[in-house]
């Protein structure tokens, strides 16, 4: 039997950012090879740093998929753990080390005997930065292994161990990264009439884009437009020639995301024209679509866990966090859910430390659900 704690702690020490998960890939392959050696009903494929493990059913009518992400974040860890990151400036601050450990535990259970239906395990790279699920899908990595149903989880620090939370609709927001540069003309602060101040235009832009949420978005639906970074100028008495802004759009429907992108572009172009500035605008959504659960499959999953002893099932509201599993769920029906890990620190925090008691709980309970799915008639 796998030692879940050691696996999680090993993985926690080697976080790597998207499409650079080389040590992680090697570690996972070593464990997977050990679990599947000599099994003629298991096949393995790789795609860059991603791994696909296909368990062929004895008389399959469908393929069930389980997806986990494997990348870390560019964060300096501050947990003080004995098994803290050994990679400088990298951390598993989003719990993907927990996700991988759960997936390996589920794989161990799944290969103990050949199931009736097919089961695919996807160890997906680059969730955080490059929408690895979309890259794999578009590159044909799944081939004829593409599931009929896809399932996955994400740890959640503000939920307790034993909590599983999901809903029958949108669970995560769709996100769009925004990069924007206004370019004017620099000059001496004493002679503003001889310059064209990009910083003034950027200031107007920051306030004007807030009207998208207040005046263009259905208040029942909601949206987020946040700019967390603004860089302009070099010193106090020089007018800024350029101003760079970096932000995000988050919405619960793709239609609203596209509307928000449209309005942001119109405001930026209008301000650039009115101030006589050049504009460089990049809107990058990629594969970060809203995570939309399939209502019938969500009903089935929620009913299953509602009846499972030791599980506290929560019908939860959507969150404005983003997840590239939304892209795969736009291609394959499925369900994502939260797994409680009871940490006082939020996801992406340098002190985020999940409760490892969630590992055996998740592997046992989710294992029962997958066993039901791959052996049902």
Curated annotation (Swiss-Prot):
UniProt KW keywords: Amino-acid biosynthesis, Diaminopimelate biosynthesis, Hydrolase, Lysine biosynthesis
Superkingdom in the source lineage: Bacteria
Catalytic activity: N-acetyl-(2S,6S)-2,6-diaminopimelate + H2O = (2S,6S)-2,6-diaminopimelate + acetate
Pathway assignment: Amino-acid biosynthesis; L-lysine biosynthesis via DAP pathway; LL-2,6-diaminopimelate from (S)-tetrahydrodipicolinate (acetylase route): step 3/3
GO biological process assignments: diaminopimelate biosynthetic process; lysine biosynthetic process via diaminopimelate
EC number: 3.5.1.47
GO molecular function: N-acetyldiaminopimelate deacetylase activity
Enzyme class: hydrolase
List of catalytic residues: 69, 128
Family from the record: Belongs to the peptidase M20A family. N-acetyldiaminopimelate deacetylase subfamily.
Described function: Catalyzes the conversion of N-acetyl-diaminopimelate to diaminopimelate and acetate.
Name recorded for this polypeptide: N-acetyldiaminopimelate deacetylase
UniProt source species: Streptococcus sanguinis (strain SK36)
């Amino acid at each position: 039997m796998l030692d879940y704690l050691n696996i999680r702690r090993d993985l926690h020490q080697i976080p790597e950012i998207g499409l650079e998960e080389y040590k992680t890939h090697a570690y996972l392959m070593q464990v997977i090879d050990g679990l599947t050696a000599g099994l003629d009903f298991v096949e393995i494929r790789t795609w860059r740093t991603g791994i696909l493990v296909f368990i062929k059913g004895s008389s399959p009518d469908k393929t069930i998929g389980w997806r986990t992400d494997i990348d870390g974040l560019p964060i300096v860890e501050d947990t003080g753990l004995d098994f803290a990151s050994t990679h400088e400036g990298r951390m598993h601050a989003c719990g993907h080390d927990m996700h991988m450990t759960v997936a390996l535990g589920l794989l161990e259970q799944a290969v103990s005997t050949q199931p009736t239906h097919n089961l695919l395990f996807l160890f997906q790279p680059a969730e955080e930065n490059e929408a690895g699920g979309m890259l794999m899908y578009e590159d044909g990595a799944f081939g004829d292994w593409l599931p009929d149903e896809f399932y996955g989880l994400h740890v959640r620090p503000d939920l307790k161990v034993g909590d599983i939370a999901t809903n029958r609709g949108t669970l995560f927001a769709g996100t769009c990264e925004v990069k924007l540069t206004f370019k004017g003309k620099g000059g001496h602060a004493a002679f503003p009439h001889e310059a064209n101040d990009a910083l003034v235009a950027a200031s107007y832009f920051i306030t004007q884009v807030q009207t998208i949420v207040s005046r263009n978005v259905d208040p029942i639906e909601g949206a987020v437009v946040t700019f967390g970074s603004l860089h302009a100028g070099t010193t106090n008495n020089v007018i800024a020639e350029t101003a760079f802004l970096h932000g995000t759009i988050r919405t619960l429907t793709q239609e609203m995301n596209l509307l928000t992108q449209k309005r942001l572009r119109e405001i930026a172009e209008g301000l650039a024209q009115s101030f006589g500035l050049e504009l460089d605008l990049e809107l990058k959504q990629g594969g970060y679509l809203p995570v939309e659960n399939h209502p019938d499959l969500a009903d089935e999953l929620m009913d299953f866990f509602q009846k499972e002893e030791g599980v506290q099932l929560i019908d939860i509201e959507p969150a404005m966090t983003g997840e590239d599993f939304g892209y795969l769920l736009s291609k394959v029906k499925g369900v994502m859910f939260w797994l409680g890990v009871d940490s006082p620190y939020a996801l992406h925090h340098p002190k985020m430390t999940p409760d490892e008691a969630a590992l055996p709980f998740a592997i046992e309970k989710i294992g029962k659900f997958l066993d039901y799915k791959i052996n049902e008639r």
